[in-house]
From Swiss-Prot:
<keyword id="KW-0934">Plastid</keyword>
<dbReference type="GO" id="GO:0043693">
    <property type="term" value="P:monoterpene biosynthetic process"/>
</dbReference>
<feature type="binding site">
    <location>
        <position position="321"/>
    </location>
    <ligand>
        <name>dimethylallyl diphosphate</name>
    </ligand>
</feature>
<keyword id="KW-0460">Magnesium</keyword>
<feature type="binding site">
    <location>
        <position position="119"/>
    </location>
    <ligand>
        <name>isopentenyl diphosphate</name>
    </ligand>
</feature>
<protein>
    <recommendedName>
        <fullName>Heterodimeric geranylgeranyl pyrophosphate synthase large subunit 1, chloroplastic</fullName>
        <ecNumber>2.5.1.-</ecNumber>
        <ecNumber>2.5.1.1</ecNumber>
        <ecNumber>2.5.1.29</ecNumber>
        <ecNumber>2.5.1.10</ecNumber>
    </recommendedName>
</protein>
<comment type="subunit">
    <text>Forms homodimers. Part of a heterodimeric geranyl(geranyl)diphosphate synthase. Interacts with GGR.</text>
</comment>
<dbReference type="GO" id="GO:0009513">
    <property type="term" value="C:etioplast"/>
</dbReference>
<comment type="function">
    <text>Heterodimeric geranyl(geranyl)-diphosphate (GPP) synthase large subunit. In vitro, the large subunit catalyzes mainly the trans-addition of the three molecules of IPP onto DMAPP to form geranylgeranyl pyrophosphate while the small subunit alone is inactive. Upon association of the two subunits, the product profile changes and the production of gerany-diphosphate is strongly increased.</text>
</comment>
<feature type="binding site">
    <location>
        <position position="161"/>
    </location>
    <ligand>
        <name>Mg(2+) 2</name>
    </ligand>
</feature>
<feature type="modified residue" description="N-acetylserine">
    <location>
        <position position="52"/>
    </location>
</feature>
<dbReference type="GO" id="GO:0046872">
    <property type="term" value="F:metal ion binding"/>
</dbReference>
<feature type="transit peptide" description="Chloroplast">
    <location>
        <begin position="1"/>
        <end position="51"/>
    </location>
</feature>
<dbReference type="GO" id="GO:0045337">
    <property type="term" value="P:farnesyl diphosphate biosynthetic process"/>
</dbReference>
<feature type="binding site">
    <location>
        <position position="167"/>
    </location>
    <ligand>
        <name>isopentenyl diphosphate</name>
    </ligand>
</feature>
<comment type="pathway">
    <text>Isoprenoid biosynthesis; geranyl diphosphate biosynthesis; geranyl diphosphate from dimethylallyl diphosphate and isopentenyl diphosphate: step 1/1.</text>
</comment>
<comment type="similarity">
    <text>Belongs to the FPP/GGPP synthase family.</text>
</comment>
Length: 371
């Protein structure tokens, strides 16, 4: 498959036209074109070039398949650990333990439970790429993590995925009850916008850019984003593979998973003072790694144990959900992930290679993660 693109109109049909999963939806061009492009690497100049240095991969592809390498001088693990620690401190400060204690305990339980912090790190890296400071991006970074945590709390509820384990710990509703878990998610959702609007420095970021950032975040989680993906996802359980295809699955995950990653990068670029061109290139980059994240997640769900993942393994298979391995097969899913990684990296061609290194490494981190 040389190209996989969702156009502005997406038609997904079922033989029974009254099935809730049947959709005729006008998308906001949430597409990530996948083409057979050449890998990229770094030369001595300060821009990203199109020739490559490659090493073997064992997660997304078989051992004989290839991937691109980052500059040997860039230590991505130190970078992401350092940034994640700063995000954790900022989140701890933003959501202190106060009255009513129970709701704040529930919010903090999931918000501070660890996790990769991919979304806030992406937000910070995008801000720094366009010339902004880490401190400028931190309120936006915290906001996207609050919303991500909300989505996990709600996703784990019995009425959704009915999961008992998240980030290696009992899920929120198992500890605090379903009623408080719902409210904790609601509180994180509303506070994310309050924090983004009030904590972003008005001395650095113009009100126009703050309003733009708020609008982007709201769109990413509503009926043009996360909610759209979730409702089509839960309506697709048990569908016959003959009735759905790759476009259907892409619609789900470009909205359910990629939309918030896209917002993370876009918010970072907006508050960092990025140009419209820089913002759109980072949008496309994040859209591709968002879809990549889900493809890899589906692969890990059928190849790793619950202990390795820190969450229940094989739950999508048990729930008869649509996944990339189910539709494409495991090997084709790995090949598709490799194409997504290359396409994402191509969006960063021409940026300063020193500043772009974290984002290139982040794409590979998502592609080759083990949990």
């Amino acid at each position: 498959m040389a190209s996989v693109t969702l156009g502005s109109w997406i038609v997904v049909h079922h033989h029974n036209h009254h099935h809730p999963s049947s959709i005729l939806t006008k998308s906001r061009s949430r597409s990530c074109p996948i083409t057979l492009t050449k890998p990229i690497s770094f030369r001595s100049k300060r821009t990203v070039s199109s020739s490559s240095s490659i090493v073997s991969s064992s997660v997304v592809t078989k051992e004989d398949n290839l991937r691109q390498s980052e500059p040997s001088s860039f230590d991505f693990m130190s970078y992401i650990i350092t940034k994640a620690e700063l995000v954790n401190k900022a989140l701890d400060s933003a959501v202190p333990l106060r009255e009513p204690l129970k709701i704040h305990e529930a919010m903090r339980y999931s918000l501070l439970a660890g996790g990769k912090r991919v979304r806030p790190v992406l937000c910070i890296a995008a801000c720094e790429l366009v010339g902004g400071e880490e401190s400028t991006a931190m309120p936006a970074a915290c906001a996207v993590e609050m919303i991500h945590t909300m989505s996990l709390i709600h996703d784990d509820l019995p009425c959704m995925d009915n999961d008992d384990l998240r980030r290696g710990k009992p899920t929120n509703h198992k500890v605090f009850g379903e009623d408080v878990a719902v409210l904790a998610g609601d509180a994180l959702l509303s506070f994310a916008f309050e924090h983004l609007a009030s904590a972003t420095s008005s001395d650095v970021v113009s009100p126009v850019r703050v309003v733009r950032a708020v609008g982007e975040l709201a769109k990413a989680i509503g009926t043009e984003g996360l909610v759209a993906g979730q409702v089509v996802d839960i309506s697709s359980e048990g569908l016959d593979l003959n009735d759905v295809g790759l476009e259907h699955l892409e619609f789900i995950h470009l909205h359910k998973t990629a939309a918030l990653l896209e917002a993370s990068a876009v918010l970072g670029a907006i508050v960092g003072g990025g140009s419209d061109d820089e913002i759109e290139r980072l949008r496309k980059f994040a859209r591709c790694i968002g879809l990549l994240f889900q493809v890899v997640d589906d692969i890990l769900d059928v190849t790793k144990s619950s202990k390795e993942l820190g969450k229940t393994a094989g739950k999508d298979l048990i729930a008869d959900k649509l996944t990339y391995p189910k539709i494409m097969g495991l090997e084709k899913s790995r090949e598709f992930a490799e194409k997504l990684n290359r396409e994402a990296r191509d969006q960063l061609l021409g940026f300063d290679s020193d500043k772009v290194a974290p984002l290139l490494a982040l794409a590979n981190y998502i592609a080759y993660r083990q949990n």
